[in-house]
Regions:
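Membrane-embedded alpha-helical bundles that constitute the cytochrome b-like, heme-associated redox core
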Residues: 1-196
Length: 196
């Protein structure tokens, strides 16, 4: 993987996680980061354009089909998150409570899809991780704890605003990273029986 892809992917991950600390950042900063995410995702797609060119080529097994479904679904949900985010902008005054909640619901759905997307794309690396039998259970347990701490289900179903967690932006971000790591671990449980 080239350095540009790595830098863009890391920035995407960091900014996306920060966005879930909506309670702890200025609304204007939240929107600026959102614009940054849109720019980065366009760049990300451009850097991975060869993947899209190969979609119609070759045979599809379950793993490749699953990866394609996750990637396309994640892209669609991300676009919807951006659309409703723009409609909900404090500077446009064209949104409503409905657009705000749809923005939030798609945003929280994106967390789950982010975990699935990363899992399908870094799958080969999982087999190389040492002490998987210790690390994966820790990821899963902490991920479940994080889901509870941020009351993820009620956010996903639109029952609450963007965040009701207490603490600070760092703690809140760690919780969401924990959720992503949990999903990655769950989708790579088969690696526990493989030797490094």
């Amino acid at each position: 993987m080239n350095s540009k892809k790595i830098i863009v992917d890391i920035l995407l991950f960091i900014l996306m996680i920060i966005e879930y600390s909506r309670l702890y950042i200025n609304p204007t900063v939240h929107e600026i980061i959102g614009i940054g995410l849109i720019i980065l995702i366009i760049f990300h797609i451009y850097l991975n354009r060869n993947y899209f060119k190969r979609i119609k080529k070759g045979k599809y097994n379950f793993k490749r089909s699953f990866k394609l479904v996750i990637n396309i679904t994640f892209l669609i949900v991300f676009i919807l998150t951006c659309i409703f985010g723009i409609l909900s902008s404090q500077f446009l005054s064209i949104g409503s409570l409905t657009t705000i909640y749809l923005h939030k619901i798609f945003a929280y759905l994106s967390v789950l899809l982010l975990g699935l997307h990363l899992s399908t794309n870094i799958n080969p690396l999982m087999a190389k991780i040492s002490y998987k039998k210790i690390i994966f259970p820790i990821f899963i347990i902490f991920g479940i704890y994080s889901l509870i701490q941020v009351d993820f289900w009620n956010h996903l179903t639109g029952r609450y605003g963007f965040s009701i967690t207490t603490g600070n932006i760092l703690i809140n971000s760690i919780y969401y990273i924990g959720i992503v790591l949990m999903i990655i671990a769950l989708l790579n449980l088969d690696k526990l029986t493989q030797k490094n």
